[in-house]
A protein has these predicted regions:
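N-terminal membrane-anchoring alpha-helices
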Residues: 8-26
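Post-HEXXH active-site segment of zinc metalloproteases
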Residues: 94, 110-138
């Protein structure tokens, strides 16, 4: 097999995949309630998931409107609380839902993973490839579409075309 042909084929596949990524259609949603209530509904939606992981209670949730942060959200294990920074999401409900789910996973980890507190040392263990962050991203990606679909069914949000 000619190595040049393989290189050109690989580049072509990459270009097509990149163009498809750029033009993918992402569903857009609009609130039928407040942002605070939306975040609470996402958190309530995770109730059965918390039960299957043996977590008995929800974290508290605070929604910050007033300051844009580098962070989308944060889980604070010492107070079992989640803070969501709305201005960091630019009103994208899919992203807000993903962030709540991501922080819920950290709540589960804080209760069930003995290494959770140690791995919070991002200076030592890094952030992006840190196991707890990878697991939280996998969790949000696994559940975000079903959560949004159920919230549509329940009238909390609706799709816009």
């Amino acid at each position: 097999m000619n190595p040049d042909w393989l290189l050109y084929f690989s580049i072509t596949c990459f270009v097509f995949a990149f163009v498809a990524y750029l033009f993918r259609s992402e569903d857009k949603y609009k609130l039928n309630t407040s942002n605070v209530q939306f975040c609470r509904e996402v958190m309530k939606w995770t109730g059965p998931i918390l039960v299957t992981h043996g977590v008995k209670y929800f974290p508290s949730i605070t929604v910050r409107y007033n300051k844009k942060s580098r962070k989308m959200g944060v889980y604070i294990p010492s107070s079992n609380s989640i803070v969501i920074y709305l201005k960091s999401h630019d009103g994208n409900l899919s992203d807000i839902c993903s962030t709540v789910l991501h922080e819920i996973k950290h709540h589960i980890q804080s209760k069930k993973d003995p290494e959770f507190r140690k791995l919070l040392n991002y200076n030592k263990y890094g952030y992006y490839n840190n196991r707890i962050e990878r697991e939280a991203r996998d969790f949000e990606n696994a559940y975000v579409q079903n959560c949004l679909k159920d919230l549509c069914k329940n009238g909390i949000i609706h799709k816009v075309m």
